[in-house]
A protein has these predicted regions:
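Conserved Nudix-box catalytic region and its N-terminal flanking loop in Nudix hydrolases
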Residues: 21-62
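Short helix-loop capping/hinge motifs at secondary-structure junctions, enriched
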Residues: 22, 103-107
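Short, well-ordered beta-strand micro-motif
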Residues: 16, 96-100, 116-119
Length: 152
């Protein structure tokens, strides 16, 4: 067991598209020592005993009310480390899936501050958190594995 095991993060995230737009949810994050509102893909932590495709469906439903149709399609994985106060390190791995949803409009759930469809140009301007880099790289040219690190 690694020294990071107690704080590791395993996540599953949904890429939901409608035409040329992608669905994002608003969150409040601690970045660079301050609180910042970010636009993130719907998703979050995989719970104990949960499979990745189950987690992405649950998180999408909790955050937007949308229901996944069928099995999500794997797109890419991002992993890295996050260094927080006092130099503690946390390893994280996030899996991203294209999902098809049952018809309906997304509505912000209790865990998020809002929902918004972003165009490619809006994504380039709005996605500024360090962990957004891999998604933007994937959009620009593909790839299936990305590594990054960030510091609070």
């Amino acid at each position: 067991m690694s020294e990071l095991a107690g704080a590791d993060f395993l996540g599953a995230f949904a890429v939901v598209t409608r035409g040329d737009r992608t669905l994002f949810v608003a969150n409040e994050r601690r970045i660079g020592g301050g609180s910042v509102r970010t636009w993130d893909l719907p998703g979050g932590r995989v719970e104990a005993g949960e499979l990745l495709h189950e987690a992405v469906a649950r998180e999408l439903r909790e955050e937007t009310g949308l229901v996944v149709r069928g099995i999500p399609h794997f797109l890419f994985v991002q992993e890295g480390e996050r260094v927080v106060a006092a130099g503690r390190r946390h390893a994280w791995r996030s899996f991203f899936f294209a999902v098809e949803v049952v018809e309906g409009e997304p509505v912000a759930g209790n865990e998020v501050l809002g929902v918004r469809w972003l165009s490619r140009g809006e994504m380039e301007r709005e996605l500024v958190a360090p962990y957004h880099d891999s998604f933007l790289q994937w959009l620009r040219g593909g790839g299936q594995w990305f590594r990054s690190a960030w510091r609070d």
